[in-house]
Swiss-Prot record:
Protein name in the entry: 1-deoxy-D-xylulose-5-phosphate synthase
Gene3D superfamilies: 3.40.50.920, 3.40.50.970
Keyword set includes DNA-binding: no
Family indicated by similarity: Belongs to the transketolase family. DXPS subfamily.
Catalytic activity: D-glyceraldehyde 3-phosphate + pyruvate + H(+) = 1-deoxy-D-xylulose 5-phosphate + CO2
Species per Swiss-Prot/TrEMBL record: Rhodococcus jostii (strain RHA1)
A GO molecular function held by the record: 1-deoxy-D-xylulose-5-phosphate synthase activity
GO biological process, alphabetically ordered: 1-deoxy-D-xylulose 5-phosphate biosynthetic process; isopentenyl diphosphate biosynthetic process, methylerythritol 4-phosphate pathway; terpenoid biosynthetic process; thiamine biosynthetic process
Residues involved in Mg(2+) binding: D145, N175
Amino acid sequence: MGVLARIQTPDDLRQLNSAEMKQLAAEIREFLVQKVAATGGHLGPNLGVVELTLALHRIFDSPADPIIFDTGHQAYVHKILTGRKDDFDSLRKQGGLSGYPCRAESDHDWVESSHASASLSYADGLAKAFELTGQDRHVVAVVGDGALTGGMCWEALNNIAAGKDRSVVIVVNDNGRSYAPTIGGLADHLAALRLQPGYERILDSGRRMVKKLPWVGRTAYSVLHGMKAGLKDAVAPQVMFTDLGIKYLGPVDGHDEAALESALRRAKAFGGPVIVHAVTRKGMGYAPAENHVADQMHSTGVIDPITGRGTGSASADWTSVFSAELIDQASHRQDIVAITAAMAGPTGLAAFGEKYPDRMFDVGIAEQHAVTSAAGLALGGLHPVVAVYSTFLNRAFDQLLMDVALLKLPVTLVLDRAGITGNDGASHNGMWDMSLLGIVPGMKVAAPRDTATLREELDEALAVDDGPTALRFPKGTVGDDVPAVSRLDGVVDILRAPSGRNDVLIVSVGAFAGLALAAAERLEQQGISATVVDPRWVLPVPESLVKLAEDYTMVVTVEDSGLHGGVGSTVSAALRAAGVDVPCRDLGVPQQFLDHASRAQIHAELGLTAQDVARQITGWFAGLGNLRPEQQNGVVADLDAQRAEKQQG
């Protein structure tokens, strides 16, 4: 029996000797590779925190001592050690193990962290609560993967430092590759110099001496200066944290479990706020991840566990289409610049940065700063494009409203992963954006349905110079283009226009065009005539769409976003404002936190399939009392089928 098979709770870890701990770390890495390869997930970050998580659970008494993982995708090892290893075959699947900490799964999961930079604020609040209620507990926050670039961390640190007697242990999981050169005698010598008061003076003296030498000396200085710059981040935390009044321990080798235990034991005994700086390597122990240049296999789909290569299709996705089009636009518009918040690869801006390095700005995990910095770029005469995941726009709403929209600045937001994203759970669904954007004065929002309209609408957004614009598109592959039959007033695309009766006008939003067309075909079989339109620009509601609605018995909107404040509600409001007395119904995502599952499974649960949409519209249409004799049989039969299904369910 292997060591991992004997681990059911953190208490079991404390019975192991040094050799068994090393064996356990190796077994956990093998387990992670095999399981994540089959389900997809965050592989690289978890391979990098194996020893760190083992040490945390050996030194601290979870769940009495909360261990809070910032950007909780690095909590897989924590889950393995807290009784959930047998559930990993269901990782990120419907009804299975969440890819993030989950309070419903275990008492060891205090929060459901997945958005970065929040762990220190949680820790600050918990420590204050324990102090006020007389509980002698330690609070641990594990923060890494760039989360310290988020301003919220520094707001929290400012407050944590004031609690001199509160035991808050902040573990900085530093897996940046800038520490790769810090090995050998030179690294040891520079580390010793850093601890001396005259470190900077000695470096300055050395710089002057070396630069006086022939050109070789200048080259040598450049190399040494580069090494210093690469290592500077190892010095800065100590200075910054100790100046705040927080004790600093480290850097510690994040893959030396014994050294980590020693540092954590000292931190625990200190009795006040402490930083433990652990230097780790993302993807540690798995060659395909260690050698993955882009991000050490930060997040993967299903892969071959031997080669690390993906097994999915290579079809074009929304992100790559946007990336190519933005590069093309920038080739003939020098005013276009791009901004991302530590998501250059996932949002498609990495290629833009390679092509136009001086026009690309990665600001770290700082969405608030990204948007207001974009405002500054716009004030300077440029047209910034801010590409973020839809769910992360929530963090920058005030900046969008007050720093961009109030000034009527031409800033374009590109919201990737809009709508239901699925496997990453409630925190990553991009279902809130329309509700937020809809209340911003002067905001214009486009929802492309395919490759052609994405390119077209990005071009149109970049032409707007009197206010903010946004494009939203979903996760995944694009699919075939959905051609329009005609375009109304140069704005609204007519995708389906049956001759004769005008029963139902279906307003499809973005990539739901295919769904709307399939539902319309089903309605036709019931004798209900359905026209399908794509407004393209969903905010503000096009006047031509409002005028078109006058001719129909009923209007139905179908969208992959929240119903409250979504496209449906804005269309209804526009119809009322124009005095158009036509019933308007909306189909979309209810305003609730949705459990993780595939996008298709969630859409099915929400009734956002062609069959369900057609049935819902059939019921509404019948309820209006407008059925003609020739429609009765088909509609009645369909309603009977719905009742039978409900009874069986």
